[in-house]
Amino acid sequence: MVQLAKVPILGNDIIHVGYNIHDHLVETIIKHCPSSTYVICNDTNLSKVPYYQQLVLEFKASLPEGSRLLTYVVKPGETSKSRETKAQLEDYLLVEGCTRDTVMVAIGGGVIGDMIGFVASTFMRGVRVVQVPTSLLAMVDSSIGGKTAIDTPLGKNFIGAFWQPKFVLVDIKWLETLAKREFINGMAEVIKTACIWNADEFTRLESNASLFLNVVNGAKNVKVTNQLTNEIDEISNTDIEAMLDHTYKLVLESIKVKAEVVSSDERESSLRNLLNFGHSIGHAYEAILTPQALHGECVSIGMVKEAELSRYFGILSPTQVARLSKILVAYGLPVSPDEKWFKELTLHKKTPLDILLKKMSIDKKNEGSKKKVVILESIGKCYGDSAQFVSDEDLRFILTDETLVYPFKDIPADQQKVVIPPGSKSISNRALILAALGEGQCKIKNLLHSDDTKHMLTAVHELKGATISWEDNGETVVVEGHGGSTLSACADPLYLGNAGTASRFLTSLAALVNSTPSQKYIVLTGNARMQQRPIAPLVDSLRANGTKIEYLNNEGSLPIKVYTDSVFKGGRIELAATVSSQYVSSILMCAPYAEEPVTLALVGGKPISKLYVDMTIKMMEKFGINVETSTTEPYTYYIPKGHYINPSEYVIESDASSATYPLAFAAMTGTTVTVPNIGFESLQGDARFARDVLKPMGCKITQTATSTTVSGPPVGTLKPLKHVDMEPMTDAFLTACVVAAISHDSDPNSANTTTIEGIANQRVKECNRILAMATELAKFGVKTTELPDGIQVHGLNSIKDLKVPSDSSGPVGVCTYDDHRVAMSFSLLAGMVNSQNERDEVANPVRILERHCTGKTWPGWWDVLHSELGAKLDGAEPLECTSKKNSKKSVVIIGMRAAGKTTISKWCASALGYKLVDLDELFEQQHNNQSVKQFVVENGWEKFREEETRIFKEVIQNYGDDGYVFSTGGGIVESAESRKALKDFASSGGYVLHLHRDIEETIVFLQSDPSRPAYVEEIREVWNRREGWYKECSNFSFFAPHCSAEAEFQALRRSFSKHIATITGVREIEIPSGRSAFVCLTFDDLTEQTENLTPICYGCEAVEVRVDHLANYSADFVSKQLSILRKATDSIPIIFTVRTMKQGGNFPDEEFKTLRELYDIALKNGVEFLDLELTLPTDIQYEVINKRGNTKIIGSHHDFQGLYSWDDAEWENRFNQALTLDVDVVKFVGTAVNFEDNLRLEHFRDTHKNKPLIAVNMTSKGSISRVLNNVLTPVTSDLLPNSAAPGQLTVAQINKMYTSMGGIEPKELFVVGKPIGHSRSPILHNTGYEILGLPHKFDKFETESAQLVKEKLLDGNKNFGGAAVTIPLKLDIMQYMDELTDAAKVIGAVNTVIPLGNKKFKGDNTDWLGIRNALINNGVPEYVGHTAGLVIGAGGTSRAALYALHSLGCKKIFIINRTTSKLKPLIESLPSEFNIIGIESTKSIEEIKEHVGVAVSCVPADKPLDDELLSKLERFLVKGAHAAFVPTLLEAAYKPSVTPVMTISQDKYQWHVVPGSQMLVHQGVAQFEKWTGFKGPFKAIFDAVTKE
């Protein structure tokens, strides 16, 4: 029964804790805080809670005469905790006439409590405040102790005061409506207080974790009627009464700790900062991961890191760290920023080491630049009575998974250390199985606390095999075995990580598990490596004995499904045990529970690691079952039926494999190490390592029955071991390898070789350990030779020969392959590098990757190496963070034959500047130029697929990061191994692009192509089979329709080039910063609308595809629509929108499966923007956000019903949600009921500027909001059948309305120069103004005088908006410019004058843009780095041409001219990096090796070409034949429309030619954009300019 409890703080019983105490709450406030005015303050979310409404009504009813109750509601979220909100509340209090006797009642979470407390501390120089916390975090933390504050833009809680409340009234009932994640978030502070102060409460929390999580996870959303407004609200509801006693106690006990600490240290001078345990590091993570991560989640990670820091210092035991980590996980909190679910929640944000340390430096506990951290001594007790100083070096080590090991230089030769390794993994796992199957209680001591045993304990618990509890502050595990009778199938898969021992033992145990009415099987699974490790021999034996087992993925490996309604028969069982002795132990331990006595016969050769089998048999004997070894049959055992009887206590011997590392440290450093609890009586084979390996290598060994001491010889005098059979201790071979690496002798013929055999099983451990050692030793300069069942290590002549692992780019890390033994072995060798150098020599450390993998067997190894053995360690930013910046991930193109892979691969390579490899051609090169078709005829498809896979894996391995395009054969996806390789490459950041087109067109084409191998089956069947594989293996796709004309072909090329540039990040997707718009398409099929799509998009920065309006949602149809749109609009950015019905669209609200598929199509097609509704299920939102790649996300919310005014909390909540999701743009659409709704919207817009915001009102009353919206305003077009939303306007309508409001000022623009009578500039610009509804006017100003232009226009026309400058003023006008663009400076002329305001002007030149954009628009890639350029002529325009070709990436530009003497001064006047080569003679052209694919003619067009110049030109035109794209020549002259240069280029040499009219219009459109900020409607302008 929950009683009202009162907790004293600072000498007063003011903290009251209870359940459903609203009567007491009202009575306490009114009785003990008499006042004329009570002010209840809360946020709008709390107003929806019935319990709050009940409290307000009761408060009103209980007011004494002469008192009044005011309520003040603020918007929810951290943004309300501001100076502005505080000021608004203070103004409200003053207006309402509140005086010094006012009592503030803060009802809410930490934001409300902090802010209202601060208002109370300053209003009228301090009024009374009562805290009524409603969140768990507020109840146990922020409401207690009197800390109040607000946030500023420079940091949280920087402005505030200590102001103790009169009461803190804690009612557990508030937690019923607390959201699940907030509930779990609060548990971090609860666990923290128990951790630092109350060990008994920590133990109680441990035992109630599953109850808590079950109840909290069972929370449901319910609809309730608001008692104050009669509105229907939806709130979360948790069944608190199902865990009321636990919740009450956890809140009460946590409050007691904080109250006691605050009472001792109110102003946080010493003891109170112990409450900051987990916060020093946690706050640093929070600073980076906010708002995605919550405070408690970051503190949880911080607690684990700070506990690991204490363990690193040798203060906290590994067991205590494991307990803390386990309890946090049990309550649903993260323990590492790298947990998969937490990374997805925080949107894969990086937490760089330097940023974390920088954030940690801003901490009130610090003293100057010295950082302080709370150090834990044990669960329930801190080290010292305040935080301790910690170095950045130690923090770096704790905060990263990459470790720097410095040379073992300062370790004294006479050092003697005693090291106790953790309990044996092998014995720990066996003891847990035996105790779970046994009857009675068994106290297991020195159990290894590691990933392996954690998985085993979890499995035993989930299978209800035993009751598990802890004693001795978690050091002793108490197993209450039930004799196997309670083993029951569990519904969830048992995840075992990379725990091979647990997986093998549990496979046999699964055969003894009973079915339940709802569950007839169990699933065992693990991580990626576990799903490669073998388990087949064990499964085969169990299957043969009657247990039904299925493989769920790879044959012979986890995951497996074990059916629990089959039986473990017993009798004779044959088992192949040449790979792992764990198979044998697994069956041995479960055999007594079979239906019949078991005879276990080991077949297939000599069993591996027989000592481990002997260990199992000896342990079974301790638990009451005697195994008899056959005297007549080798390797055969008899196991009787029976039950284990648990010994009252079982002490786990230390792990002998782990003991090899400190013992080897002694050997390598010439020091002495003693392991006091492993001797010659050990059950473990690895106990022989010191005697059989280190002693013959020159070490002094002292071994008793229970201890081992190793003293190493002087450093550098270890001897190689000619031969050692390590079969009895296979896991120790890695340690032997690193010792052998620095062993040498005086025999010139020995090559310092140590030969190790008997370890073949080590190839199928956590990794292929023999290969791993060979690979990593080579990085240190140590050579090895692999043997069939072992390895030879060729030691170095001197330790000084050891190298720091590095490559051409600098130091590299030692890869540990997620293998604990690899990591620990190389931590020793790493310290020997440079250890013999002079003391003052700077020595580079060795980097070890993935240090946390040692957690499998020795989580505290690094702590022992550092604190016990004296090694200097540091942490470092992961190498991949720096190396990946420089890598150029390759592109793999897959798809059916005839999908266009060969052509598009060339385009791809050209667009990115990558190298191209056709894998079919590479195949032929590697097979003596035999064609694929011939190879298939001779060897069959299966052999070809094997070779194809091998080649693919090789090129990815060697060139996956080096900027290649790999064009594959259509059938590469037929091979499962190839599919895996493709998926692995995609998941590593590579680009796998699925190229596809209409299958019917493909079939027609393929049936008529004799050059390709014949299909055995019909093409359609092949497509049906492969289609899913293509989609599964690719992370991007491109729909490439067949092209029937060259113009279509070039349009497709431009479309693809922009697509590939977008998905690879070469082309950045920009969110417009100024006024901009997107048009909303409402067609059901774009196929028939291609002619209209360009004019529909005039004036827009993006186009929205309303997918919910499309005729069907199939992947092919939708992809085709995107392709059509890109091609027709020259790849204007696409907004991909699927609008659901409840958000005003056509898409069914609950069709989430189809919705996911559509979003997948969008992201694979690399759409620039994706509209994500904020009302969708959270899992869909996070899935899209985490897969978005370069796509920008628009978080949208629409109020079609007009339910919410713009000052309603709904919009604030949705905006905060959008911030949490970290969308790129927020889009809110309301409904204007009256004109005032637009004013409220503008206030909202004005106060929400931290994300680009599209905010508009629907209906005609809301039109003004569309005019005032300044980023990506949704618009319609007169060419659309209907608008996408009520009240939508066209771009022209918006501009005209905005002009009428004074938003756009009418400008006068001119073309200046002489003669300009025939200038097309006025019609060019005025056409654009008319179409876009702009008020400007473009006219002619004819003059030869730049002075006159300055007087009349620059100085004399107040409406001057810009000038297009033509001859003869392009040079003269420059003197009047205040700024010149780079283009104007280099080209040496100005053709565009841009007003900057205040009578200042910028001179620009857009001729080069006219050239560049005209070329790109005609199929020239945006980057042509592998092609040279050519300029014909050396006049003024040639400078713009050279500038343009350089901007396209031409590495070399040739220039020819009739008068060659003009070339040299021209070239010398331009930057040397343009690499311009002037051609003096025709002969020199023959020696040019480069392909020339792009040219610009700048010679007069009205005269015939000089013969010499013509000869040079023709020799260059020949060089276009082998360019990577259709060679293209631009004619700079506008008239005549066809020039002599164009004729000869096109007719004789098949160059594509571009008329000068296109350059004219492109440069004019560039001017248009610079002057107006709008993209010019190119097609309409071009038609107007060229219509005569």
UniProtKB/Swiss-Prot annotation:
Region (Shikimate kinase): 890-1080
Biological processes per GO annotation: amino acid biosynthetic process; aromatic amino acid family biosynthetic process; chorismate biosynthetic process
One GO MF term: ATP binding
Region annotated 3-dehydroquinate synthase, chain positions: 1-392
Quaternary state and interactors: Homodimer.
Role according to the record: The AROM polypeptide catalyzes 5 consecutive enzymatic reactions in prechorismate polyaromatic amino acid biosynthesis.
Listed name of the protein: Pentafunctional AROM polypeptide
